[in-house]
């Protein structure tokens, strides 16, 4: 038997590999962390880096919430839509989700590198704005190749600002980096579950095609919000 939930046991393999990589990198991670602690302590003693813009943080978290809602909604409702309304088989529909998520990994890496060269605002605004085009095209794709192309671009752009937003919020909260990480990676992304649930209710009420065709509005809204957020001078 080729498919089935019994194959989930093979996910142990990447977990073991990740454990080995982390164990190997742990000495270097500890060294970097100790350097940061010393540097942060010096800032606290000198009174530097204490200013926090709570309004900027709020809008950054709102941006992350919208981005995560779109990302989670697409890979949640994608297979349902293409199987029910486009007649795709289970394997093809599931492959679309894998392509969407894998291109997100590539987009995160590219976005982080470009952020160092172009600045965080251009990546945060530009990436999610560009994602609205393929996301809007996804529900209109009728052929598997067109759907794969659309979800590839959507997955690449929608999440490519992930690392950048984490760093920006950490810079906004220089003395609370742990909390900044929790707010960006935990709270805001976790709240996307509420957004997905809301869109699910709308899909049940008005139909999944209408919701998927309208979801491209959220990236545009997020891009507008991000364009108005003052960036910390340390990373401009």
Predicted features, each with a name:
Residues 1-31:
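Helix-loop-helix hairpin linking two adjacent transmembrane segments in secondary transporters
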Residues 19-27, 216-236:
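Multi-pass alpha-helical transporter architecture, strongest
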Residues 26-60:
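Juxtamembrane intracellular "pre-TM" segments in multi-pass secondary transporters
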Residues 53-108:
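Extracytoplasmic gate region of multi-pass secondary transporters
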Residues 107-119, 203-204:
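Helix-to-loop junctions at the C-terminal end of transmembrane segments
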Residues 122-137, 216:
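Structural signature of the two symmetry-related core transmembrane helices
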Residues 160-173:
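Intracellular juxtamembrane helix-capping segments at the cytosolic ends
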Residues 172-208, 215:
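A late C-terminal transmembrane helix in Major Facilitator Superfamily
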């Amino acid at each position: 038997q080729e498919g089935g939930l019994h194959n989930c046991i093979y996910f142990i393999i990447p977990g073991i590999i990740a454990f080995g990589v982390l164990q190997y990198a742990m000495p270097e991670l500890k060294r970097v962390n100790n350097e940061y602690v010393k540097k942060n302590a010096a800032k606290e003693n000198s009174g530097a880096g204490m200013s926090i813009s709570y309004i900027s943080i709020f809008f950054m978290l709102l941006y992350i919430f919208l981005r995560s809602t779109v990302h989670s909604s697409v890979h949640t409702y994608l297979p349902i839509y293409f199987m029910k309304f486009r007649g795709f088989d289970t394997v093809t529909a599931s492959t679309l989700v894998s392509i969407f998520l894998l291109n997100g990994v590539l987009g995160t890496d590219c976005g982080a590198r470009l952020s160092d060269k172009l600045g965080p605002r251009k990546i945060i605004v530009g990436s999610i704005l560009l994602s609205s085009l393929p996301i809007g095209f996804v529900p209109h794709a009728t052929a598997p190749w067109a759907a794969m192309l659309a979800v590839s671009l959507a997955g690449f752009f929608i999440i490519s600002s992930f690392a950048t937003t984490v760093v920006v919020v950490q810079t906004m909260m220089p003395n609370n980096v742990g909390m900044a990480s929790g707010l960006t990676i935990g709270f805001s992304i976790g709240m996307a579950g509420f957004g997905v649930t809301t869109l699910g209710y709308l899909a049940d009420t008005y139909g999944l095609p209408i919701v998927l065709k309208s979801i491209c509005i959220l990236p545009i809204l997020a891009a507008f919000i991000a364009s108005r957020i003052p960036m910390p001078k340390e990373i401009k």
